[in-house]
Amino acid sequence: MAGLYIHIPFCESRCIYCGFYSTTSLKLRDDYTNALCREMQMRPAKAALGSNETIETIYLGGGTPSQLNGSHLNQIFSAIRKNYTLAENMEITMECNPDDVTGDFCETLKQLPINRISMGAQTFCNERLRFLHRRHNAGEVEEAVTRLRNIGIRNISIDLMFGFPEESLSQWMSDIRHAIQLDVEHISAYSLMYEEGTPLYHMLKQGKISEIDEEYSRKMYETLIDQLTGAGYEHYEISNFARPGFRSRHNSSYWHEVPYIGIGAAAHSYNRKQRSWNIENIQTYIRSISDGILPSESEQLDIFTRYNDLITTTLRTSDGINLMKMEQEFGKELADRLLQEAQSHISRGLMKIKNGRLSLTREGLYISDDVMSDFMII
C-alpha cells in the first residue's frame, strides 16, 4: 500500500502566517496541470517506490486545490487512473477554502471521486479571520459544511488555530464549541506559528503584536484536548482529533512509515530507503517536466536517519512505537537504546509503555519536540 500526494500551489491570496510554497498568480494553472499529469507518467509507482504498490490514499494539498476548475481536476484524476493501481476503498482528500465551496464547486465535486474535504476554518471570529488575511467569514464555514453534506460528503475535516495575540481562553473555547456544533468528522488544531519570512513574523519583530506566553498556550492546548475528547473525538495525534473510524488515513500513513509518492512543485516522495523532493519554483518545474526531466533531488536513508524519522513521526501518534516491530526492523542495539533513553521520561510521567508500545503521555504531548530530541542520533 502507498499514498499519493498532489501539490497544488495556487492561492487567490496569501495568509500572513503561511510559510508553505505557493503563488497567487493563477495564469500557470493550465501548464501546471499538464505538468502534473506528465510527471505521473514519468514517475510510476515502481520507479518511485521500488515496487508496483497499490495506492490507497490520495491527497490534493496546497496552496489551495479548490483554485483549480473542474477541467483541471478531471484531467488530474484521469492521469491518476491511467498511471497507478488504485485500491477499491480509497480515501481521497481535497483541501479547500470555505468560500470556494460554492454551488458550482459542489457540482464539480459530484463528478469526482473525492470523498473527504479538509477546510481551513482557523477561527469563527471574523476579526481574527481578517487579522490572518483569510478570505472567508465565519458564516461561510457553516454554509460550506451544509453544501458538502447535501452532495453526500460524509468525511469533513476542519483546521483551527489558537494562540492569537490577545486571544482569551473564553474566545478559544467559543471556537472549539463552534467546531463541535458543526459535527464534522475530524478536527486539526495548531498553535499560531511565527515562521521567519512571513508577514506575521515581521509584525512580531516590529513590535506590532505580542506572542502569548508558553504557559497560556499550554492551557489552551489542554482545553482543546478536554473539550474535543469530551465530545467524543479521539485524540490520535498531537494536533489531530477524529470521530471513531475517521482518522486521516493519508496523514496516518506519513506517521507510520507507509511509502508515498509526491507529485508537483515542492512535493516529497518516500519509500523507506530513499527520500526525494521536487524543485519549488513552479516555472522551473513546468519547464523541466516539459523537457522530460524530473526536477528532483534525493537522499539515501541509512538506518540512523530512518530511526530518527521513526522517532519524529510515530511518537506523534497515540499508537506510539511498536517495540517488537521496532527491534525486528532496526535491531536489538537500537531497540535497547530507545528503551534506555525512554526510562527518564517514563519516570517523569512524560512517556508510557502499554501493550508493547512506547508513547507520549498527555503531559509529554505538549513538550513533544523536547522529548523526541533526546532520542535523536546526530
PLM-predicted stretches and their roles:
Residues 1, 22-46, 54-332:
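C-terminal scaffold of the Radical SAM
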Residues 1-8:
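Immediate flanking context of iron-sulfur cluster ligation sites
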Residues 9-20:
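Local cysteine-cluster metal-coordination motifs and their immediate loop/turn environment
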Residues 332-344:
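Short amphipathic alpha-helical interaction segments
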Residues 347-356:
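A short, conserved structural fragment
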Residues 357-361:
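Minor-groove-contacting beta-hairpin "wing" of winged helix-turn-helix DNA-binding domains
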Residues 363-378:
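Short, amphipathic alpha-helical interaction segments positioned at domain boundaries
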